[in-house]
Amino acid sequence: MLELTQTPQGVILLVKAQPGARKNEVAGERSGRLLVKCTQAPEKGKANDAIVEILAKALDVRKSRISLISGQTNSEKKFLIEDATIEEINKQLGIDS
């Protein structure tokens, strides 16, 4: 089950990043984290920027509403999706709440 945390600012989403993949995609859940694959290499924040774009598209939100709050140099990351609810995130990802 995907771990999501509601905060006054929005929803904290745990992500397992897989940089250097063949294509950009949200590839399901792994150990409570959303698995996000991106083609960018993990250098100079390129993969983080790509993951923000992938999440924005998957969640149908503006990139400016997504902030990386921890894991800048780690494959396990935390993102804040501003002004969102857990129900909205689950709906956009096709997860039954």
Predicted feature residues:
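Contiguous, often N-terminal, cationic amphipathic patches that form binding interfaces
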Residues: 1-45, 49-52, 61-63, 67-72, ...
